[in-house]
């Protein structure tokens, strides 16, 4: 995957991926700040600022931003994560310059209006209601993450705690913007039917005069391994399903641990609960009929430690304690017997096939480049996928033995009330 990378004197990094299959361009800007950077008291401020970024600049009113994109047949949006906040326009390639003009204006001269801020805060509170507070499973998972990431930058949800959202001040937004929205804290990603060199020159034209900012080096505490078993339970409506959530603290590719561990954990996630043929699916869903669904999830592409999550949706009236005991028993058995070569080979093929096929999407290409750049990793995604083939049975056994023990486990049971 050929990626053309450049940088400006003010610290802005640019990554361009040419794809000539259609006359379109996806232009993105990624800021290296997300909810994991936020101190207590203003959790969710990155997400709140994302909303305010569409309220206008000195050059473009909010109506201008919307009409320019819509009238040119494009779409625009944004998203916030633990590690970054990104904005994008997707439209005909002739509009690349307009994308860059909009984003340079937003980076340098966003307008903050209390008359826009107050109603938008209500919008965010309602978004929290719809996505989290009114959904038992989402609310429970939020509490599970809080427990697992206790005393770290990821303890709070991306959208923020309700009481913090209610107490935001406009000055909080201004300060967050001034601290983090600067060229030396951003990556521009351009993917589509464009000329890389010409695209870089356009970026240079619109961004080179924006000054650097003194970015505060925020040190976020990371979760520690083997700090003791953490458990909680939540009761909810009797009409909703019950669930078991389990998580083991594990390293990512950004942490200073054995470089093979994240790749072995990717393989293990697929073998344990990543597909219909996975061990947990076969044992707990099909053979024992304890759950209607179970899966495992792990990503090596995070800033700091990650959590290897196992989620099980219980069948009617099944004991959640029995389900967790069964999962732990299966993990212990896999430790003792090891995975088979067939399981290992199948997982490698499935993971690589899924990733390669997903790269057919322009959005996926750009999002991968942007997320990798934002957490300080090499943007050549295939480099990581190819390393999966080096994972051995012993590597998988090693990570099972190292990380999958009771002292490194957090679990939450979502019970019927």
Regions found by a protein language model. Give the residues of each.
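Short pre-active-site segment immediately N-terminal to the catalytic Zn-binding motif
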Residues: 34-42
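Non-catalytic beta-strand/loop surface segments
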Residues: 1-35, 59-95, 131-185, 209-255, ...
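Active-site SXXK
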Residues: 43-57
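Generic, well-ordered alpha-helical scaffold segments in large soluble proteins
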Residues: 106, 127, 202-209, 249, ...
């Amino acid at each position: 995957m050929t990626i053309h990378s450049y940088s400006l004197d003010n610290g802005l990094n640019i990554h361009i991926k040419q794809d000539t299959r259609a006359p379109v361009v996806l232009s993105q800007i990624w800021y290296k700040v997300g909810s994991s950077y936020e101190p207590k008291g203003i959790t969710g401020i990155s997400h709140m600022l994302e909303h305010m970024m569409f309220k206008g600049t000195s050059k473009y009113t909010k109506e201008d931003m919307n009409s320019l994109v819509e009238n040119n047949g494009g779409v625009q949006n944004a998203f916030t994560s633990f590690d970054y906040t990104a904005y994008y326009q997707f439209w005909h390639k002739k509009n690349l310059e307009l994308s860059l003009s909009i984003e340079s204006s937003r980076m340098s001269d966003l307008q903050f209006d209390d008359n826009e801020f107050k109603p938008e805060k209500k919008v965010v509170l309602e978004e929290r209601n719809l996505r989290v507070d009114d959904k038992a499973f989402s609310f429970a998972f939020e509490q599970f993450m809080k427990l697992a990431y206790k005393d770290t930058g990821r303890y709070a949800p991306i959208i923020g705690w309700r009481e913090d959202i209610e107490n935001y001040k406009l000055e909080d937004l201004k300060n967050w913007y001034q601290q983090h929205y600067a060229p030396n804290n951003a990556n521009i990603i351009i993917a589509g039917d464009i000329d890389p060199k010409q695209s870089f020159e356009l970026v240079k034209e619109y961004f080179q005069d924006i000054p650097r900012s003194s970015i505060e080096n925020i040190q976020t505490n990371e979760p520690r391994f083997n700090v003791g078993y953490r458990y909680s339970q939540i009761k909810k409506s009797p009409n909703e399903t019950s669930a078991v959530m389990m998580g083991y603290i594990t390293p990512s590719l950004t942490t200073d641990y054995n470089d093979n561990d994240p790749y072995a954990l990717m393989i293990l996630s697929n073998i344990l609960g990543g597909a219909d043929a996975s061990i947990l699916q076969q044992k707990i869903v099909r053979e024992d009929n304890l759950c209607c669904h179970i899966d495992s999830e792990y990503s090596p592409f995070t800033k700091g430690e990650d959590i290897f999550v196992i989620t099980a949706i219980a069948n009617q009236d099944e004991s959640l304690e029995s389900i967790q005991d069964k999962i732990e028993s299966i993990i212990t058995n896999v430790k003792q017997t090891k995975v088979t070569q067939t399981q290992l080979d199948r997982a490698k093929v499935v993971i690589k096939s899924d990733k390669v096929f997903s790269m057919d999407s322009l959005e996926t290409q750009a999002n991968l480049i942007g997320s990798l750049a934002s957490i300080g990793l090499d943007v050549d995604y295939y480099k990581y996928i190819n390393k999966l083939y080096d994972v051995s049975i012993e590597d998988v056994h090693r990570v099972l033995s190292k990380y999958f023990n009771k002292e490194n486990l957090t679990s939450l049971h979502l019970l019927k009330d």
